[in-house]
UniProtKB/Swiss-Prot annotation:
Pfam families found in the cross-reference section: TPP_enzyme_C (PF02775)
Subunit structure, as described in the record: Heterotetramer of one alpha, one beta, one delta and one gamma chain.
GO biological process per UniProt: organic acid metabolic process; sulfur compound biosynthetic process
Class of the enzyme per the UniProt entry, highest EC level: oxidoreductase
EC identifiers of the protein: 1.2.7.7
Organism: Pyrococcus furiosus (strain ATCC 43587 / DSM 3638 / JCM 8422 / Vc1)
GO molecular function list: 3-methyl-2-oxobutanoate dehydrogenase (ferredoxin) activity; thiamine pyrophosphate binding
Tree of life domain: Archaea
UniProt keywords, alphabetically: Oxidoreductase
Protein name: Ketoisovalerate oxidoreductase subunit VorB
Lineage: Archaea, Methanobacteriati, Methanobacteriota, Thermococci, Thermococcales
InterPro entries found in the cross-reference section: PorB-like, THDP-binding, TPP_enzyme_TPP-bd
Signal peptide (from-to): none
Length: 311
């Protein structure tokens, strides 16, 4: 169906689709929506590298695929290495990489394949300065293998190897600040994004496309299956993660920080509003919630100071 021109003028999200219906994601999957936005932003002239993760399955079983772009499946820990090699090979053959008329080399990996098992390859990619974009879709656990904790799993969360109940083995470590590790490499561009704010996400994808050198985006992508949440609440949960400052939106560009919160002067909502929609937090005690709230507000104040000093 043709989209009316008056609607096109009001919407900044591209209308073209390169991620099609019929894929095998769970209902309410945040990762599949995020991947759809990536392909809307970059189009068919994209080489997408996906390691072992949910998105490998979502893309479709051979010989079918829901993705209308070049797709390279690779081993769990190798995303950073593979996008480095593809970018180097394209340049050696004389192709333009990055830019609006260049080939986009994109790594698309989960938090387990990035923050944990793939951290070494990610660091090498960043340090060498390759012209590619690495996107970590953050659903805060190893969802494809059975909802095991990752270093991106938040304090107080239930997973299959941090179970709740009477023995109370919930996750007792705070979420790893992967974006800080990335920024420590002094790359030109890094950002956080959320599926609840698609225009902000696509703007950041477009900026990463234009900037020479490596770019990194950490995308908050709820998993209703692993988070024990209603499938129709993924966007609301993602929005509350931002509104509570649990997952603030910001950019780091050439040494400068910029906060992208929808209402930057508004005080964050209580963390309980984010937690109560998810069954993975149902075992948290009052003290657990207070501990997480304290950490969230401390990290939020730290980010505001960084933006103030290095903005």
């Amino acid at each position: 169906m043709e989209v009316p021109e008056n609607i096109k003028k009001r919407v900044t999200i591209p209308f073209e689709e390169h991620f099609y219906a019929g894929h095998t994601a769970c209902q309410g999957c945040g990762a599949s929506l995020g991947l759809r936005y990536v392909l809307k932003a970059y189009g068919k002239k994209t080489i997408l590298v996906i390691p072992a993760c949910c998105s490998t399955i979502i893309a479709g079983p051979w010989p079918y695929s829901a993705i209308d772009a070049n797709l390279f499946h690779t081993a769990f820990e190798t995303t950073g290495a593979v996008i480095s090699g593809i970018e180097a090979a394209l340049k050696a053959m004389g192709y333009k990489v990055k830019g609006e008329d260049g080939i986009m080399v994109v790594g698309w990996a989960g938090d387990g394949g990035t923050a944990d098992i793939g951290l070494q390859a990610l660091s090498g990619f960043l340090e060498r300065g390759h012209d590619a974009v690495y996107i970590m879709y953050d659903n805060e656990a190893y969802m494809n293998t059975g909802i095991q904790r990752s270093s991106s799993t938040p304090y107080g969360a239930w997973t299959t190897n941090t179970p709740g109940g009477r023995r109370h083995f919930l996750e007792k470590r705070h979420k790893k600040k992967v974006i800080d590790i990335v920024i420590a490499h002094r790359i030109p561009y890094a950002a956080t994004a959320s599926i609840a704010y698609p225009e902000d996400f696509i703007r950041k994808l477009k900026k990463a496309q234009k900037i020479s050198g490596p770019s990194f985006i950490q995308l908050f992508a709820p998993c209703p299956t692993g988070w024990r949440a209603p499938t129709d609440k993924s966007i609301e949960i993602a929005r509350l993660a931002v509104q509570t400052a649990y997952f603030p939106l910001f950019e780091y560009e050439n040494g400068k920080y910029k906060i992208n919160m929808p209402n930057p002067k508004k005080e964050p909502k209580p963390i309980e509003e984010f937690l109560k929609l998810q069954g993975r937090f149902k075992y948290m005690t009052k003290e657990d919630i207070e501990t997480l709230q304290k950490w969230v507000l401390e990290e939020w104040e730290r980010l505001k100071k960084l933006a103030e000093v290095f903005g």
